[in-house]
A protein has these predicted regions:
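Juxtamembrane intracellular "pre-TM" segments in multi-pass secondary transporters
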Residues: 1-7, 187-216
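Extracytoplasmic gate region of multi-pass secondary transporters
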Residues: 32, 211-253, 257-260
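Helix-breaking motifs and short loop linkers at transmembrane-helix boundaries and internal kinks
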Residues: 43, 75, 94-101, 113, ...
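Conserved MFS/SLC helix-loop-helix module at the cytosolic interface between two early adjacent transmembrane helices
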Residues: 62-100
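Structural signature of the two symmetry-related core transmembrane helices
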Residues: 78-93, 277-292, 369
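Cytoplasmic helix-loop-helix junction between adjacent transmembrane helices
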Residues: 104-146
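Helix-loop-helix hairpin linking two adjacent transmembrane segments in secondary transporters
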Residues: 131, 139-187
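C-terminal transmembrane helical hairpin of 12-TM major facilitator-type secondary transporters
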Residues: 273-323
Length: 396
């Protein structure tokens, strides 16, 4: 394949999987604003709804490693195509939910599909964009923000004029169209062979060196912070800053709008400069912004600080993936990224519990202050790595 042909193919595949990620994230993020309507319609409690969403997240996290490992041993396409199919089924099931049981099934099936898609699609981009890996992963990661912005608007219209089920069938149809486009463009073979999961080897490889262990700890702290902030930020604004629900939602949407720009930019800067250096800067900016937001109350200042917070922490997503992939062996990128992201998502899932407990028995200021400290620790860990790396180069 000529260089031009490779670049054209890589660009088309970037478009296909990035749009797929954006659409599935749009579908996933519809659940949060539609949850009150779902609870009322199905006659379930908030606790039950929370357990169902937790099941979705657990299934998604658990599927990360095997999907990455199998995509290494077979091909990326062998996992991506079934992932599209499972996602189509999962979102279509939401359209016909008639009770709690079907709601659980739809959530679990969709979580499996998302887990099957997440790592192989990222690994595919890493395969295709060796010199511009950060930029490609940044464009891909921005799909989360596209989905978040779209979900906020669609959910508002849905609860006013339609049933909560209405948006999910169009999501399934869009994913089906993207799957067809992906199959039409794909040049990888589809292969199913007898294989085993070497999770012990993958984990030992990831933690073999202190630098790798420290990187995992730093980004686990980052994901812990994200889980705590994202899930409670609108509630924090309404309960402590006297924001209306509408104003809190609008302020929260700023995070996604900023992320849409910052993620590709951070990835591109990481390709040209130092990924760790950019990550440290982002962590420090987010830590300062998270501390400042607890002591201000004027809406305009909160919007400014919220935007700065987003600038800081949104840089972390493409850089975390790229740093893990940079250090992974060429035949084990999917497995390494899958195992690392399983750890990150586990930390992410603990974040909301931490904020909820601390806010209940103390206050949000202490909870968010603790998250800011986590970011400072993460930045310190990465800064030490950078200093040691520089010293090593000088010693040579």
């Amino acid at each position: 394949m000529s260089e031009d042909a490779h670049d054209q193919y890589a660009t088309r595949m970037l478009a296909a999987v990035s749009l797929g990620w954006a659409v599935l994230q749009f579908g996933r993020m519809l659940l949060s604003p539609l949850l009150p309507a779902i609870i009322t319609d199905l006659g379930i409690t908030e606790a039950t709804a929370g357990i169902v969403l937790a099941a979705f997240q657990i299934v998604y996290a658990v599927t990360q490693y095997p999907s990455g490992e199998f995509s290494d041993q077979w091909t990326r396409a062998t996992l991506i195509m079934p992932a599209f199919a499972v996602l189509v089924i999962g979102f279509a099931l939401f359209d016909i939910v008639n009770g709690l049981g079907m709601f659980v099934v739809a959530a679990v099936v969709t979580g499996i599909g998302k887990g099957l898609f997440s790592i192989p699609s990222r690994a595919l981009l890493s395969d295709l964009f060796t010199t511009n890996r950060g930029r490609a992963l940044g464009i891909y990661a921005a799909g989360t923000d596209v989905g978040g912005i779209a979900a906020a608007g669609v959910a508002t219209v849905t609860v006013t004029y339609a049933s909560w089920r209405t948006p999910f069938l169009p999501v399934a149809i869009l994913l089906g169209i993207l799957a067809t486009w992906y199959v039409f463009m794909n040049r990888e073979r589809y292969a199913l062979e007898r294989t085993t999961l070497d999770i012990g080897g993958t984990v030992s490889g990831l933690i073999q060196h202190s630098r790798q262990r420290e990187t995992l700890i730093a980004f686990a702290l980052f994901y812990f912070m994200v889980g705590g902030v994202v899930n409670f930020y609108p509630t924090y604004l309404t309960q402590t800053k006297d924001f209306s629900a509408e104003l809190a939602s609008l302020t929260f949407a700023l995070i996604f709008i900023v992320g849409l720009i910052i993620k590709p930019s951070a990835g591109m800067l990481g390709d040209r400069l130092s990924r760790i250096g950019i990550a440290i800067t982002g962590l420090l900016i987010a830590a300062v912004a998270l501390s400042v937001v607890t002591v201000i109350s004027t809406p305009i200042y909160i919007w400014i600080i919220t935007s700065i917070l987003a600038i800081g922490y949104k840089t972390g997503f493409p850089l975390a993936d790229a740093i893990i992939l940079d250090g992974a062996p060429s035949d084990g990128m999917g497995a390494d990224l899958g195992a690392a992201r399983a750890l990150f998502l586990g930390a992410n899932a603990i974040g909301p519990a931490y904020v909820g407990i601390v806010a209940t028995y103390a206050n949000y200021e202490i909870a968010f202050g603790g998250l800011a400290v986590c970011l400072l620790f993460a930045a310190g860990i990465l800064a030490r790595q950078r200093i040691n790396s520089t010293d090593g180069v000088r010693a040579d």
